[in-house]
Amino acid sequence: MAELLLGVNIDHIATLRNARGTPYPDPVQAAFVAEQAGADGITVHLREDRRHITDRDVRILRETLQTRMNLEMAVTEEMLNIACEVKPHFCCLVPEKRQEVTTEGGLDVAGQQEKIDNAVARLSQANILVSLFIDADKRQIDAAVASGAAYIEIHTGAYADAPDDETRQHEFERIRDAATYAAAKGLKVNAGHGLTYHNVLPIAALPEMHELNIGHAIIGRAVISGLKDAVAEMKSLMREARR
C-alpha cells in the first residue's frame, strides 16, 4: 500500500497571531517546523474575510515551502486571481460563509457545475492541480469527475462530530464507499475536517486515501505538548536576569 501523505493546516497559528495583532506566532515558521517533522505539504485557507491567513502569508509561504502548498479557497473571482498569480501546487475549492466558525459542509459541485468547471479549467491552465472539497456523495463525485478536477477531498466532519458510535460507523461507511467509488472513477482521494488523534485511524487505513489534511488537532496538541518547554524557557530567562 502506498504511503499516506499528511498535509498540515496551519490556519490556527495565524488565528493565535491575529488574536493579539502581533507578528507572532509566525505561520511561516510553523510551516518550516511542520515540514521538518515530516509533513508532506502545508495547507492554508485564505478566507474572504482574512480572519487568519493573510495574502502576505500566502505569498511568503509559496516562496519558502520545501514541500507542497495547498491553498484552500472559495470559488470567487478574487481568489481565482490570487491563485493564478501565486501558483500554489494545489488549490482546494471549498464553500465559504462569512458567519461560519469553520467550513461547515462540502462544496455543491453538482448544483453549480458550470461555475466549478470554469474554475477548474482556469486553475488547470495555470498549471495548478485542483481538488474539490465535497461530501461523501456519489452525485457530487460524478460532478467532480465531470469538472475535470484530478482530486477530491472528502469532508469528514460528520464522521468526526458523530454523537455516538453507531452514527460514527454509519458516517465512516459513507466515506469508505465514497472513496472506493471515486477511486474507481479515476480520482485521487484526500480527506479532512475534524480529524484528530482519536478518530484518524479508520480513515487512514482506507487504501484509497492519498492524503489527509489535518490542522486544528495538531495545533491543539502542539500547544499542550510544547507548554512544558515554553514555561521552563521563560522561567530560565527570568532567573538569568536576576543573576
Curated annotation (Swiss-Prot):
**One BP annotation, GO:** pyridoxine biosynthetic process
Q: Does the keyword Chaperone apply?
A: no
Give GO terms: molecular function aspect only.
pyridoxine 5'-phosphate synthase activity
Q: Which positions are annotated as binding 1-deoxy-D-xylulose 5-phosphate?
A: 11-12, 47, 52, 102
Record's CDD domains? PNPsynthase
Site positions for Transition state stabilizer, renumbered to this chain?
Answer: 153
EC number(s) from the headed UniProt entry: 2.6.99.2
Cite the annotated pathway.
Answer: Cofactor biosynthesis; pyridoxine 5'-phosphate biosynthesis; pyridoxine 5'-phosphate from D-erythrose 4-phosphate: step 5/5
Binding of 3-amino-2-oxopropyl phosphate occurs at 9, 20, 194, 215-216
Q: Which reaction does it catalyse?
A: 3-amino-2-oxopropyl phosphate + 1-deoxy-D-xylulose 5-phosphate = pyridoxine 5'-phosphate + phosphate + 2 H2O + H(+)
Name the domain of life.
Bacteria
Q: Where in the cell is it found?
A: Cytoplasm
| Record keywords, A-Z | Cytoplasm, Pyridoxine biosynthesis, Transferase
Residues annotated as the enzyme's active site = 45, 72, 193
- Gene3D superfamilies of this UniProt entry? Aldolase class I
Q: GO CC terms for this protein?
A: cytosol
Enzyme class, broadest EC rank: transferase
Q: Which family does it belong to?
A: Belongs to the PNP synthase family.
Q: Which NCBIfam families match?
A: pdxJ, PRK05265.1-1, PRK05265.1-2, PRK05265.1-3, PRK05265.1-5
Purpose: Catalyzes the complicated ring closure reaction between the two acyclic compounds 1-deoxy-D-xylulose-5-phosphate (DXP) and 3-amino-2-oxopropyl phosphate (1-amino-acetone-3-phosphate or AAP) to form pyridoxine 5'-phosphate (PNP) and inorganic phosphate.
Q: Tell me, how does this one assemble?
A: Homooctamer; tetramer of dimers.
Per its record, how is this protein called by name?
Answer: Pyridoxine 5'-phosphate synthase
Provenance organism: Pectobacterium atrosepticum (strain SCRI 1043 / ATCC BAA-672)
- What lineage does UniProt assign to this protein's organism? Bacteria, Pseudomonadati, Pseudomonadota, Gammaproteobacteria, Enterobacterales
